[in-house]
Structure formats: C-alpha cells, structure tokens
Amino acid sequence: MVGSRSASHQKTVKIVPMTNRADKLPKSWDPQAVEKDLYEGWVEKGYFTADPSSSKPAFSIVLPPPNVTGQLHMGHALDHTLMDGIARRKRMQGYEVLWLPGMDHAGIATQTKVEAMLKETEGKSRWDYSREEFIEHVWEWKRKFGGTIGTQMRAIGDSVDWSRERFTLDEGLSRAVQTIFKQMYDRGMIYQANRLVNWSPILETAVSDIEVVYKDVEGELVSIRYGSLNDDEPHVIVATTRVETMLGDVAVAVHPDDERYADLVGTTLPHPFLPDRQMIVVADDYVDPEFGTGAVKITPAHDPNDYALGLRHNLDMPNIMDATGHIAGTGTQFDGMDRFEARVKIREALAEQGRIVKEVRPYVHSVGHSERSGEPIEPRLSLQWWVKVEKLATMAGDAIREGDTVIHPKSSEPRYFDWVDDMHDWCISRQLWWGHRIPIWYGPEDAEGNRDIVCVGPDEQPPAGYEQDPDVLDTWFSSALWPFSTMGWPDKTPELDKFYPTSVLVTAYDILFFWVARMMMFGTLAGETTPEILGQGTDGRPQIPFNDLFLHGLVRDEQGRKMSKSLGNGIDPMDWVERFGADALRFTLARGANPGVDLPVGEDSAQSSRNFATKLFNATKFALMNGAEVGTLPERSELTDADRWILDRLEEVRVSVDDYFDRYQFAKGNEALYQFAWGEFCDWYLEIAKVQIPRDMEAASAQEQARGRNTQIVLGQVLDALLRMLHPAMPFVTEVLWKALTDGESLNVAEWPTAAMTNGGVATDEVAARRMADVEKLVTEIRRFRSDQGVKPSQKVPGAVDFAAADLAAQEDLVRSLARLDQPAEDFAASASIEVRLSQATIEISVDTSGTVDKEAERKRLDKDLAAATKELETTAKKLGNESFLAKAPEAVVAKIRERQQIAQEEVARISARLEELK
C-alpha cells in the first residue's frame, strides 16, 4: 500500500459527516455568469480603495492614462493585466496599495472626433462656433462617450481605486500644469521661437513625432537643373520627391571633398522663378557625394535636415506655405495653389524652361502621415513654444545612471540613454482649442508694435486688457506630470506623503521616449523645486517619479506581425472576454509577458487559457467532492511519498514564482504555475488522490482512513496556495473556487502564500521526490507500451513488475491502479515486455495482451495515425524549409514548429515499428 505504516502506529480516524463543499460551485464554469457581479461586489466592499493613513507599507502604481476617445486594445489589455497582477499580489502581501486610474484628454484625437461629429450632425466646422461653444460640445461628448474604457476596465477586472479616478483636464491637474509651466518659464526653460515642426495642413496644427505614421507611397523623383542650361557654364543637378518645395530653396549643398563642385562652392545660382533670389553653393559634410549627383537642394523651412544645415550656414528660411498647405507669399504664379497641385504645375513650368533632366515614376519612398487626419505631414517653419530640455534630460538620465530608478529589463537602458542624451528641444504648443491653454498673456501693442508678455500662475490674474495665447499645450506635457499631479501636487497631500514616489511604472517600450522620459524629466524637476512636498531624493539628488520602470513588449499576431487595420489581424480584447472570459484573456497575456519582448497571441492561446480555467474548476470540484479541505497538515511521517512530493513541489514553485514576480518575469512565473497546476497537480496528484482516498471511508481500515484523511488535507492545502498564487492573473475563477474551498471572505484580502502554507517550511524530501519521478516515468512508459500493443486505455491487463528492485514496493498498488495493470495469476504468460530505466534500477515490465487486441482493427487505427503523423511531418518540413517564413517569424514560433516536427518524426518511427510487428 502507498505509504503504509505498521499496525502499532495506526490511528483510528473519526469519520465526521461533511457537507459537500462542491455544492457551492455551479455545474460548470461560465465566466459570463459570475464575473460582472463578482467585480461590482469587490468595488462595493472597498477592497481597491487605498487608505493614506494606513500603517501598512505603501505600494503605488499610476495607470498610464488611455485616451478618453478610445477603447481598450490588446496593448492596453496587456498593460492592465500586468498592473492588476502586481497590485493584487502586493495587497495579499500586506501592502497598502494605490492603483490610481484616469484618462487623458487626448487633445488632437478628441478634437478631431468632435469636429467630425459636428460636421456629420450639424454640417458645421469648429470655425462656425466660438471657442467656448466648441469646448462645451467637447465636454458634452466626453460626458456621453468618455466612459467606454472605464466599463471595459471593469470587465477585465482592474482593481483600481475608482474613488481617485483622474482626468488630465480636472481642475487639480490643470493647476499642476500651470504651476510647472510658470516654474519653467521663470527659469528660462520655456521659450518661443520659429523652428521646424511636423505640420498637419488638415488639422492646422503642429503634431508630435508619435502622431506621425510613416507609409511607403508611390511618388516621383524629379531631377532639376539649377544654373545655366549650357553645359559649359556653371550648373548643378539636384533630385527631389517634393518639387513644390523648390520655391523655398535658398542653397545647393555639396560635400567639401567633392572635386566636381570645388570651383562652385561660395558662388551663387539664380532661382528659376525668383529673379531676386540667388542660391549659394555651400560645402557640408551632411552631403553624401556617392548618392545621386552629389548635390542637394536646400529648403530650410520645409525639411529637417535642410533646416539643420541652414542653421549651420546662417541661411535665410523663407516659409512658402500657409497653415492649410497652400503656397503663399512667394510672389509667383503658384501662390494659392494646394501643395500637390503646385507640385504638378511647378514641374510643368520647369519642363518648359528645359530644366527637367530626369523623371522616375513610380518612385516608392517613405512619407510621414498624420495619424489622426491621414494626410502627408508638412515639415514647416512655425512660431511655437518650446521646452529647453538640456538640464531636464541630464536629470532624467542621471536618475537611471545612479540607480534611483531601475529599468526592467536592463537591456532597455541604452535606448533610454540614446534618447535623453541626444534630446532636442520639445515643441509644446498646439494650434487647437481642446486642451490646457498656454498660460501666457499678451499686453496691448505699443507704438512700435511690441507687446508685453506675462506668464500667469494658477493663483494669479493677468493684468486688465491682456489677451491669452490661443494655443494649447501638447497632451504629453500634462501626462508628463501624471505620477504626482494625480496625487494633489503642487499641494502637500496625504496621498503624496504616503504613496509618492510611485513604486513601479508599467508600460510598453514603444513610448519610452514620448511619455516615460518626459515623466522622468518633469518628475525630477518637480522634485528639485518642491522637495518639501515630494520628499528628498537619494544623496541630494531630486526625487524621482517611480522606483522601478517595467517595460513590456508589444502584442502581435501569431506570426509576429504588428496588429493593424490594413492587415485585418487586430483582436478586440472585449471579444475574448465575451467568448472566453476575462481570466482567459488575462492569463494568455500574463503567461507571455517577458520584459521588453514582444508577445505573439492568437485565438488558440485564448482557448488554451479558457481550458485551463475549466481545468482548475473541474479539479477543485473533484477535490471538494472527495472531501478536500484546508486544515492542519499531519506530521510528515504520516504522509505518503506522493503527499510529501506534491507539498515540496508546491513550495519549490512558490519560491520560484515569488522570485519571478519580484523581477517582473511574469511569463516565467505564470508558466511555472500553469505547469505545476496542470502537469503535476491535476495530471498526477489528483489521480493519486483517487487511489489514496477510499471510496467508502466508513468501510475502510483505520490505516486507509488515515491515509485518505491526510490526502484530503493535502488536497486542500495545495489548492489553497495554488489558487492564491493564480489570483493575480485569474482573479475571477480563483475567487469562486477559493471561497468554496475555504469559506474565506475574499482572495482580495487573503494572505499571499508563505512556506508555512505549503510544506510547512521543511526541507525537501529527496527520496519521495525520486520515487515519485520514477512512478511518473514508469506509469507513462507502461501506458505508452499498452497503447503500442493496441490495448484500450480502460482495459486492464495482467502485468509482472519487480517493484522492489526499483525501491517502489510501497508504490505498487498506486502504479498498478494508474497503469491499469492486474496482478499476474500463477499461469501468467507474457506476450510482450519492455525495459524501463529508473533511478535505482532498470526493470522489466511484462504483460499478457493475448485475446485483448483485434489485430485488424489495430492495423486500421495505426494506418490512420501514421497518415496523420506523416502529414504533420510534411507540413512542418515545408514551413521550416521556407526561408522567408524563418526570417520573419518570432523565435518562439519557429521553436514550436521544430518541436512539432520532432514529435512527428518520433510518431512515424513508433507507428511504423508497431505495424511491422503486426505483420
């Protein structure tokens, strides 16, 4: 018998009639039937509400604010799953957790959406309204439609503190924006200047780099001859994809070492359409002499590289377009034309002059487009407000270099330093109406046309008669204040005292520069200017906004491609919630989330996670039906090898999971839980429990009763700890199962597992571990052997095994039960045998299958299996032979296909051998 003890040590177990805890569970797991009510109950009980007066250690996260216009996409779902997992675990570990939610006003995105709505419903543009009227329309839209993301966050189980939800245009956050703007303006860190920006002619505003999407387009490459049309006289040939910009050309650049143009450097060439403009030939290392003709036209007001060269050579920078992308102010016949119409007309006019040397069509090249309005972006010289970033970037870089904030994974540090160490001044003004209006006021013009400029703080009033700057701030300006403005800065608040700096920021690596670096810049600045509010940093350095920075990868499709509308491969996370449940969505993402590594997902992944939730449900229900409960563990000496093994494995998993989660290795931690839950607890220990728990406790012997009762306690112990550890990733199914198992209040207020909750903190029983590893191998090999012999899984056959030789005498009944082997009779005659190498010996297993196998039926079955295995082998070989696929597919996908190929090869060999035996 398993774990048998001598009669002198047997105890009488009192059998107490128990209510069946499994009755507390529904018939089957249906996420849709329970998730919404569970979540609302958690919120009502205040489980997620943070208490700044608590004596518990603090842990805080701010939610990267999604756009008020948006809906949750897979990237959001990954973000939220990881943050929620962190927050839930920290609560269980005894921390006072603040997970602070909120939304971004999303200046351009929201304004364009409302403009489109007004155009459709009222046939009007924003210019048909006063600024105040239009803004009121936006607020009305926000009140009607801005709650979508909040509803979706509830659906996936976000344990945020809804009582502290913030919006970037809230009064308190607006006060923070004005405060830091004035601090920076007064320090000379904000200034106004004419510089090159990304300009959207449709939106009529500057846009940030992140709002520019690059697409390959079929255009034209036109070569233009500047200078004399006589080959014997000075001339150069330049090529451009934007012929219209030649109206802004002020120079031609060549490389200093290019002897072809050495005599031309410093001379001028007449502009074809502007007789008063002479274009100087300049020498600059920017030019590649090997590319094209080695000469480049220079349009400083409409190209970033030309702008930089223009600054170096002190060139004029004439702006040839107005805010709508029409040619303006050139004094030519092209004024008033749209830029694309002008492109054609100017090319035709140049051709008439004989200046078109060559035209290439189509010419495919990458062009930046406005993410919001879709048209090609126009680089344009524009008067804007700018942040002088030099000092801010230095502080943001030093915070990482000094270890005040730690980036996970460390491999992302070089990208961060590349950005902050080579950062250009930041354009913060936008020509919009929706957003934080720039707190700059202009006085009346004096006799010389000059105006007094005043920066007004949140508690100040502008002088009478002054007019406010019409522009608003870049959305990233206010979101850069998010970690501390949401807690009340610039006022001193209990929230800042308790929860700042925040513990960790969780976000995707693709906004490391656009958002994260700017939060570091503004966070360290606020730490430097208001240490009495935000606290002192380390070693005299400014306080930082977060201690850890966890950068996860991007969610991609199963082939590793970016999800996009054009590819039609996008996945709506809410569709998965409806079809598979929130836990399945969350576990799919959590199980694949490695720091800094992209995550390929597909429907198969979600179905697998849904199956896992069902497996947990069925396993718990089975355990409860068999009397599993949480209680005091018996003495180790009273447990079977299987009991000790599963408890020790539980402790090993707990230790590794804690280590993984502490290092933000969520994929490894959740994979460890999955493999333990399914591969060890469900597949093995539950099957063992069926053997160890008597079918009829009252009729069983005292020894069998004791063993069965111990098994019930071990079942409860393992399930209790396992459900607790899975709760951060799968909060709904674990809550239902844990409450049925323990009668506890909620996992939201339960303790995170410790060694005392697993194996009692004792050393691992290596002998029990060895024996159970041998049991698993032996049972697996016998099952495979039976299958190869054509024996049905449910059919018992007599078998002879030398258990004692393998030190498995105490496990004989267990192995025979799991492997469906009867004791051999006296007249036993083996029809087949195999050898299995175990840790202590190589033993022979002999079975008698005579009369149990229909050879003809077995041949047909094997032929069918062989055909399937051969097809799988051909399919995988074809994929692995496709060089294009191998170059594009993620390593994990290729590795999975190689594994499938290996399994198929083994199956073909095994089945072929068995067919040969049946001949």
From Swiss-Prot:
The keyword Cell inner membrane does not apply. CDD domains: Anticodon_Ia_Val (cd07962), ValRS_core (cd00817). GO terms for molecular function: aminoacyl-tRNA deacylase activity; ATP binding; valine-tRNA ligase activity. PROSITE patterns: AA_TRNA_LIGASE_I (PS00178). It catalyses: tRNA(Val) + L-valine + ATP = L-valyl-tRNA(Val) + AMP + diphosphate. Keywords: Aminoacyl-tRNA synthetase, ATP-binding, Coiled coil, Cytoplasm, Ligase, Nucleotide-binding, Protein biosynthesis. This is Valine--tRNA ligase. ValRS has two distinct active sites: one for aminoacylation and one for editing. The misactivated threonine is translocated from the active site to the editing site. GO terms for cellular component: cytosol. Belongs to the class-I aminoacyl-tRNA synthetase family. ValS type 1 subfamily. Its EC number is 6.1.1.9. The gene is valS. Catalyzes the attachment of valine to tRNA(Val). As ValRS can inadvertently accommodate and process structurally similar amino acids such as threonine, to avoid such errors, it has a 'posttransfer' editing activity that hydrolyzes mischarged Thr-tRNA(Val) in a tRNA-dependent manner. A motif ('KMSKS' region) lies at residues 562-566. One of its GO terms (biological process) is valyl-tRNA aminoacylation. NCBIfam families: PRK05729.1, valS. A motif ('HIGH' region) lies at residues 66-76.
